[in-house]
A protein has these predicted regions:
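Acidic, polar-rich low-complexity tracts and alpha-helical solenoid repeat scaffolds
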Residues: 4-9, 19, 31-290
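Sec-dependent N-terminal signal peptides
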Residues: 17-26
Length: 290
């Protein structure tokens, strides 16, 4: 009985493997057939046939195959009324395949060559979206975010009534916030590792660049704290000026956030700074009276 069960299990496994091999074989044959068909088309020298098949793949959303054919037929249509169509469809295939680097280059080329094309609005919209999709999180370099913002704002200025505008407004807010976060993270890094002078400069720049940042309260608190620590760690003849600067930051913070969760901490720092300044003034008065 055990031998029979073992035989049945082995037989079932063998049948499953055979089925999988058959499926894989069909997939490979189909793929090779598709490639062979595309290569034959490209070698046929019949641009109308190639273009027609490219459109067929395009409509079926087989982006890679469509792109291969559009690229292969493109040179036949240079200088003809169909040139912009081939260029646009090929760029959109790259976009749909999430090859945003290539798509952005193709759309950029398209918008420079075919400014009067019926596809120009869509091309410029997808050109902007390429940079949006290439834009990384705030912890990484934000060059693409900057390019996305430029392209998106140019699009909204050029096509104020486009269906894309509402979506682009949301994206604009999202990307701007990403730059806020990047600026904040850069400043916070200096603060966290104890480079308080650099932190103060970076934090103040962050506020200057993005006055409406949702990190504003925390940034202003860190300016007070970094200024306090910077003054506290300074040599004696630098401390007075640095504590005075810290108190300026403290007063700005208190004026803007009188009910802040950081109130007790900044009040404690301010008291210490004032106590130091009072003691220092008394010492100076004594020296002057001698």
């Amino acid at each position: 009985m055990r031998n029979f069960a073992r035989y049945s299990a082995v037989k079932d496994l063998s049948m499953k493997q055979t089925f999988l091999y058959a499926v894989c074989g069909v997939i490979l044959v189909t793929a090779f057939s598709g490639c062979a068909g595309i290569n034959s088309l490209l070698k046929s020298g019949q641009p109308e046939l190639i273009y027609s098949k490219a459109l067929e793949y395009y409509q079926k959303e087989k982006w890679s195959r469509a792109s291969t054919l559009f690229e292969g037929v493109q040179h036949y249509y240079i200088g003809t009324p169909r040139e912009d169509s081939v260029s646009f469809f090929n760029a959109r295939c790259k976009f749909k395949n999430r090859d945003y680097d290539t798509a952005s280059a193709l759309f950029d080329d398209f918008r420079r060559k075919f400014g009067r094309s019926a596809f120009i609005e869509d091309a410029e919209g997808m050109y902007a979206l390429c940079f949006y999709y290439l834009s990384p999180g705030p912890s990484r370099d934000q060059t693409m975010t900057g390019q996305a913002l430029i392209a998106i704002n140019e699009f909204m200025s050029r096509y104020p009534h486009s269906d894309r505008v509402e979506n682009f407004k949301q994206i604009n807010g999202e990307l701007t916030q990403r730059l806020h976060d990047k600026s904040y993270l850069n400043a916070y890094t200096y603060y966290k590792i104890g480079r308080y002078k650099s932190a103060i400069v970076s934090l103040k720049n962050a506020l200057k660049q993005f006055p409406d940042s949702n990190h504003r309260e925390e940034i202003m608190y860190m300016i007070v704290d970094a200024s306090y620590r910077f003054a506290n760690n300074s040599i004696a003849n630098k401390q007075t000026d640095r504590y005075l600067s810290m108190l300026d930051s403290y007063l700005s913070f208190k004026e803007e956030f009188p009910e802040s969760k950081y109130t007790k901490e900044v009040d404690r720092m301010a008291k210490h700074a004032r106590d130091y300044l009072d003691r220092n003034k008394k010492d100076e008065d004594k020296d002057n009276n001698i």
